[in-house]
Amino acid sequence: MSEWWKEAVVYQIYPRSFYDANGDGFGDLQGVIQKLDYIKNLGADVIWLSPVFDSPQDDNGYDISDYKNMYEKFGTNEDMFQLIDEVHKRGMKIVMDLVVNHTSDEHAWFAESRKSKDNPYRDYYLWKDPKPDGSEPNNWGSIFSGSAWTYDEGTGQYYLHYFSKKQPDLNWENEAVRREVYDVMRFWMDRGVDGWRMDVIGSISKYTDFPDYETDHSRSYIVGRYHSNGPRLHEFIQEMNREVLSHYDCMTVGEANGSDIEEAKKYTDASRQELNMIFTFEHMDIDKEQNSPNGKWQIKPFDLIALKKTMTRWQTGLMNVGWNTLYFENHDQPRVISRWGNDRKLRKECAKAFATVLHGMKGTPFIYQGEEIGMVNSDMPLEMYDDLEIKNAYRELVVENKTMSEKEFVKAVMIKGRDHARTPMQWDAGKHAGFTAGDPWIPVNSRYQDINVKESLEDQDSIFFYYQKLIQLRKQYKIMIYGDYQLLQENDPQVFSYLREYRGEKLLVVVNLSEEKALFEAPPELIHERWKVLISNYPQERADLKSISLKPYEAVMGISI
């Protein structure tokens, strides 16, 4: 099989917020089809489509009730088949979201499973007796807060759910479950789907003795090491590869929650025949206070040195073994320039700076819809947020446990809430940013009149065209894909600089990720190199990259000549 995914750039679509073709306020598959030429113009090769399968939408489609049919608001299977064909006509590929750690509680399998203890589908899920006092089987927590166990009156047992109680976890120990999953994968791949992004795949293998976490009793329920990397994880993925993936020329990326580099090597070492890539979370947690009862909502200031060290550890750790994904944004993360940068006066420079850091690295870049026009976090009030995670966290942290004040929580949500990524795509300065002729399912970002696709395409200096050029450079220079990576100036608190080397060529990336001026001094071994500037986000007069006085958020990429 070819390794086309190494040279690809992926564009992620969150369909409910991308483009609404029928005016019901909800993005749809025909809307995606209508905007394919826009994505092609950007230069992306692969579209990753967030879940479109039938679902009660408790967790925006990550709770699937039917893996072989579309959710009606997105369209029909015929619309999906048309989308696959239209993507392929343009020389692009399409990857779907595979959500098989859990289903919806409205899936036919679970409806059967909960009927009785001897139902043939009982072992499709994880059922346990209560403790003698009637409480949960153990102290495992749900990632969406509260217990990971919900009591079912009908059969007097608890079922396990790492996410919401409407997302019961599948029992991967049961071979019949695995066969069902492989059948779903073949169904879509036989119709042209080019691969999978595998949702929380790191959690499919459970510690089936269900041990309690040790606790200091500050928290009733705990999310920790037992929630991922279970004893049969890699056995299951190797079986999936053997049974399904190895029969197709496809791309696979696993959401590997709880993985360190050693775990990542197991997933991505080609000789092990598992997955092509994984998403790591480590660099996205640099602004989270570790071991806080408030989890991701206990935020600390952006620390560039920590970001550099973390990203470098992954760049060097997987070198010659596996392959990295490169991302700052997706449907679960806020807008990077609002989170770690400047989304006002220096918005354009800042967006281009973060893009330069990412696209100059080794790995497959993922662009999230709106990132390429510099979309920013929303300023909507707390009561207008739709996300289940936010609602549950508010109840647990503010109302019940009182570990955060409402003011502290609101401030954290304004920085890190997932809905910042989920507001509608901003197409133009017209009503609802051109997303819909109806009423949008979630409010449009108030800054859409200044930040939109139409404005971006009319401005040759826009963030869109900068991304387009970064992608073009990646196609032109193999060093951007295959070059080795070396961090420079690791303890500089303002400048992210690194060197790539490939077959005698050198690529230098220098980015000021601060609002102040900064200085880059080339290390001695680069003093005599001559450079050609490939791209920069300020007008460039210089030809010499040995010593650079950098403006706020200035980014320069040069190649040796």
UniProtKB/Swiss-Prot annotation:
GO terms for biological process: oligosaccharide catabolic process. It holds the Pfam family Malt_amylase_C. One of its GO terms (molecular function) is metal ion binding. Optimum temperature is 42 degrees Celsius. GO terms for cellular component: cytoplasm. Ca(2+) binds at D20, N22, D24, F26, D28. Gene3D superfamilies: Glycosidases, Golgi alpha-mannosidase II, Oligo-1,6-glucosidase, Domain 2. The record marks D332 as: Transition state stabilizer. Its EC number is 3.2.1.10. InterPro entries: Glyco_hydro_13_cat_dom, Glyco_hydro_b, Glycoside_hydrolase_SF, Malt_amylase-like_C, O16G_dom_2. Hydrolyzes various disaccharides such as sucrose, maltose, and isomaltose with different efficiencies. Also hydrolyzes longer maltodextrins from maltotriose up to maltohexaose, but not maltoheptaose, palatinose, isomaltotriose, or isomaltotetraose. Belongs to the glycosyl hydrolase 13 family. NCBIfam families: PRK10933.1. This is Oligo-1,6-glucosidase 1. It comes from Bacillus subtilis (strain 168). The lineage of its organism: Bacteria, Bacillati, Bacillota, Bacilli, Bacillales.
